[in-house]
Amino acid sequence: MAAADALPTSSASASASADGPRTGNPSTDRAIAMLLALVREGVTDVVLCPGSRSQALALVAAELERVDGVRLHVRIDERAAGFLALGLGVESGRPAPVITTSGTAVANLHPAVLEGWHSGVPMLLLTGDRPAELRGIASNQTTRQPGMFGDRVACIDVPAPEETDDDLARDALLARDAYRRARDERTPVHVNVAFRDPLSVAVPDLTEAVAEVRAAAPATPAPAGPATADVLDLPHGPRTLVVAGHAAGEAAEELARAGGWPLAAEISSGSHFGPNLVVSFRELLAREGFGDRVERVIVFGHPTLTREVPLLVGREDVEAIVVGSTGGEDYDPRHRVTAHPAAVRVVGEPADPAEARRWLGTWVHESRAILDEATAAESAPLLPSGTTPAERRDFARAELAAVRADVTRRHLVRALWQATWPHDRLVLGASRLIREADRALPGKRVRVHANRGLAGIDGTISTGLGIALASQAGSGSAAAGITRVLVGDLTLLHDVGSLLIGTGERVPRIQVIVGNDGGGTIFDGLEVSRTAAPASIDRVMFTPQRVDLASLARAYGWAHLRAATHGELEAALTTASEAPLLIEVPLAR
């Protein structure tokens, strides 16, 4: 959609009139009107980066924090701020406005905006800008900001303010409409706000204004369900596999249970649990009698972690149904999807109940056998404690050897899974480790997030911080939980600036666990590793790094633990720390 007509410009109305005291300064009064409108809509968190052109918004946000109107999160790096807002939106389901000044500050939001658009996360960008007369004439720190994020991100360019009631009411309505669109459509929305000198004055006390807008706040609407006409009825007939990709939610597990069908659920799907779960679906899709017998596949979410799923969806002999959408594009590998309903439901009964039970049972049984075999290969042999001195000595030696064993990737993800409870949050970076987790971890109802919209390593730590801040701010069980972020060393270094949490900022309970294998070993498993020269692979793909992570953590005010053995890892994951904790786990390449 075009930037100019992306959002409506509603006329003033009593239901969204400009509230709060006036200062006589158009910039400050605009900021008060817009941010109070957002508080009225239910905004609880605001992220901002310092800057001159956006100072009115920043100073009003600071006053709102002072009077407990919002929780304010200040960052000096706009890329980190964007992903922090993304994490807040992931956890809460509501956009957390992110405020920046003009120029490259806006451009640095782009990675988070792309991830938000592709993964269906609500975001609201409030970017300061020069007035029209200062654009296009090489003014300092001025570029073409409207439309910077492309024609897929809704954008409105708000002209510099005048001091009239109609203008302030319009500003409040624009803020309201932008917020609602981001929330309801689960997408980024960009409001580019021009300010003219003088850029701010002292902000008045907003205590009464916050109380008034909260008293008048509308109830948050319940998510609208799909129209009856867009619900597809599914008969039991064909041999069916349910696939839950990233952000599928619990609907995939519910459908698999209702239909009596096997469930192939990726680790960040939100459906990686339940009696129908098939963890080892990759192996079975390639095995005779399993993948070749699938007649229908029903996909929820965005599958990104396997090649087997898109191959299955693209087969001519398989009916492919993709339910809903988790981002700006519909999942349709090889353009073979036959239906794309908003929702589905199971109708009727199986024609052959015994055959239906066998179909599900063989998938679940074989998957568990594969998983048990892999677990046994990684685990220490089970020995009886013994009654004789020799038997007790052998048992003690075996126990000690298990504790002292080096950590492997599979053991790392299993130990992390075992330490994580339903009230905790787990964030997985884009590396070999998320694939290891996807292949090795049994079902468990744990909230797992990964930035799989574009599957980049950008902003993983900052996303995790946003999820931690949002989950621990509420009154539910998650408020007592901890957020663990599992990344590779390159993912950590790419987002290292996010470790900087400024003085006076909220510090959540968080552990960043770094699988440190000295570079990008994910490329060792790709085709390029079999065709390119090893020296070239190391130079331009593996990109070896040597960083003292203990010193790095200390520089940013994080605690640091090194966990090279099973025993050290178990102790580290259960360590209580006042400071955020970075756990370094050395891994072999």
From Swiss-Prot:
Pathway: Quinol/quinone metabolism; 1,4-dihydroxy-2-naphthoate biosynthesis; 1,4-dihydroxy-2-naphthoate from chorismate: step 2/7; Quinol/quinone metabolism; menaquinone biosynthesis. One of its GO terms (biological process) is menaquinone biosynthetic process. Its cofactor is Mg(2+); Mn(2+); thiamine diphosphate. It is an enzyme of class 2 (transferase). Residues 1-26 are annotated as: Disordered. It catalyses: isochorismate + 2-oxoglutarate + H(+) = 5-enolpyruvoyl-6-hydroxy-2-succinyl-cyclohex-3-ene-1-carboxylate + CO2. Pfam families: TPP_enzyme_C, TPP_enzyme_N. One of its GO terms (molecular function) is manganese ion binding. Residues 1-18 have a biased composition (Low complexity). It comes from the Bacteria. Binds 1 thiamine pyrophosphate per subunit. Keywords: Magnesium, Manganese, Menaquinone biosynthesis, Metal-binding, Thiamine pyrophosphate, Transferase. Its EC number is 2.2.1.9. HAMAP family: MenD. Belongs to the TPP enzyme family. MenD subfamily. Catalyzes the thiamine diphosphate-dependent decarboxylation of 2-oxoglutarate and the subsequent addition of the resulting succinic semialdehyde-thiamine pyrophosphate anion to isochorismate to yield 2-succinyl-5-enolpyruvyl-6-hydroxy-3-cyclohexene-1-carboxylate (SEPHCHC). Homodimer. This is 2-succinyl-5-enolpyruvyl-6-hydroxy-3-cyclohexene-1-carboxylate synthase. It comes from Clavibacter sepedonicus (Clavibacter michiganensis subsp. sepedonicus). The lineage of its organism: Bacteria, Bacillati, Actinomycetota, Actinomycetes, Micrococcales.
